[in-house]
Amino acid sequence: LDLGSGSGEMLCTWARDYGIIGVGIDMSQLFTERAKLRAEELGVADRVEFIHGDAVGYVADEKFGVAACLGATWIGGGVAGTIDLLAKSLRTKGIILIGEPYWRQLPTTEDAAKGCLANSISDFLMLPHLLASFDDLDYDVVEMVLADQDSWDRYEAAKWLTMRQWLEANPDDDFAKEVRTTLTLEPKRYAAYTREYLGWGVFALMAR
C-alpha cells in the first residue's frame, strides 16, 4: 500500500522487479492517470491498482505486508499520525516505510528554514531525534536509505533542465515569466539552503 503514490513509479517498478501486488492512492488525478500509464508501459497493470482519492484516513479492506508513505506525512498530520494510519492497513510483522526530510544541520534562523521551503525549524527533526521518535512510538528501525548531496543535486537539477526546455518550447505561455523567475532563482536558493541544511531518508519500521 502506498499512500500519496504520485506517478506510481515505486509500485510499478517493484511489481516488475519483485512481482509484488500493490495499491496506490493519490489525490492528483493527473498523477493517478500517469501511474496507470506507467503500469501499462511496464506490463504490470494486472498487479497494481491506482486509485484517485484522498489518502487522509484511508484504511485498506485487506492487510498489506508493506505500507508506505514517502514524502507525504501530512496525510496523517505528521510522522506519528501517518505511522498510526499505515499500521491499520498492515499485516502482523509487516513493514512500514516512511519517507521524511530531516535537518542535516539545524538552521541558524527561521529565514534559513524557510529557504529550505519549510514553514519553520520545528517542521523537521535532526536525524538522531527522528530515529528516536520511532523508538518512542515502539517501532524498530530495521533499514534506512538516505539521500546524499549528490543525489539531491541530481533530483533538483533535473527540474531546472525541465523548466529550461519548457521555456524554449513555450516562450509565450502565460506562465513563462513565472517559470523564468523560478529557474533563475532556484539553483542559488537550493545551493544556499536545501543542499546544506536538509536531508531526506526512507525508514523501514517494524512494530515491537
Residue ranges with predicted function:
Residues 123-138:
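Short alpha-helix
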